[in-house]
Regions:
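N-terminal glycine-rich phosphate-binding loop for ADP-containing cofactors
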Residues: 1-242
Length: 242
């Protein structure tokens, strides 16, 4: 039983809300929308609201009012495009970082140090964040982009970037899915955090930090910081500039 005023919503992080609505009775379609909370929802402020062509505007208005006033969240309204806004941008960034990590021969722990608090982001950086999210989940998000974007699909100038990185494919094949399975880009052994060596697919001692010189660069005002990174020759600085 569903009350005639009840709102039906999906928490999908990127599947088409319009396509999901096609399985619903016509009477429910006007009350159906997407409401994407970010994990862990207890702490993450952002919520995406996504309508379909048949969603009544009042449904989104009422949901936004409730989510902001009762739950204290910050709402953005997203179009019904693959992975909406945050995951579309976020996964593109992660894939670019994986590619540049390989190109500059950097290790995952160093890159996490560079892309974490030093850039004003979460201390987990890139690869630790991927482990927490789940590498299988990450792969599903990537596949949503692969299935829906491209020259013969929805145009996206960055669609060539959405290939599955070989290291991710190998981790998925070995069932090392991140934190949920105890191993991914990192693996905890006793009290030690080991990091993956992508060449051997074995875990080695981790905990390396970025070069102190690069760390000092990132503390400079924005203009000076960019100038220093542009002129620097080290792999870590070139990685950040890339």
């Amino acid at each position: 039983f569903l009350a005639p005023h009840a709102i039906v919503a999906s928490n999908t992080s990127g599947l088409s809300i319009t396509r999901l609505s096609e399985a619903l009775p016509d009477a429910i379609k006007p009350r159906f929308c997407g409401i994407h909370f970010f994990n862990p929802p207890r702490y993450m402020t952002l919520v995406e609201l996504i309508n379909t062509p048949t969603t009544e505007p009042k449904v989104l208005d009422d949901l936004e009012a409730f989510v902001t006033s009762a739950l204290g969240k910050g709402v953005i309204r997203a179009h019904d495009t693959p992975n909406f806004i945050a995951n579309r941008v976020g996964i593109a960034g992660m894939l670019a970082i994986i590619k540049q990590t390989e190109a500059f021969g950097l290790t995952y722990d160093v890159v996490d140090d560079l892309t974490g608090k030093k850039l004003g982001r979460a201390s987990s950086g890139t690869f630790r964040t991927a482990d927490v999210v789940g590498l299988d989940t990450m792969a599903h998000v990537v596949k949503t982009l692969q299935d829906n974007l491209g020259p013969d699909k929805t145009p996206d100038p960055f669609s060539d970037m959405y290939g599955t990185p070989p290291v991710l494919a190998k981790l998925l094949e070995s069932k090392n899915l991140g934190q949920k399975t105890g191993a991914g880009f990192y693996k905890k052994v006793g009290r030690d955090i080991m990091r993956l060596d992508p060449e051997t697919m074995e875990y080695v001692a981790g905990g390396a930090k970025a070069n102190e010189v690069v760390g000092r660069m990132l503390k400079k005002p924005a203009g000076e910081r960019l100038k220093l990174l542009r002129e620097a020759e080290g792999a870590e600085a070139r990685f950040l500039w890339a």
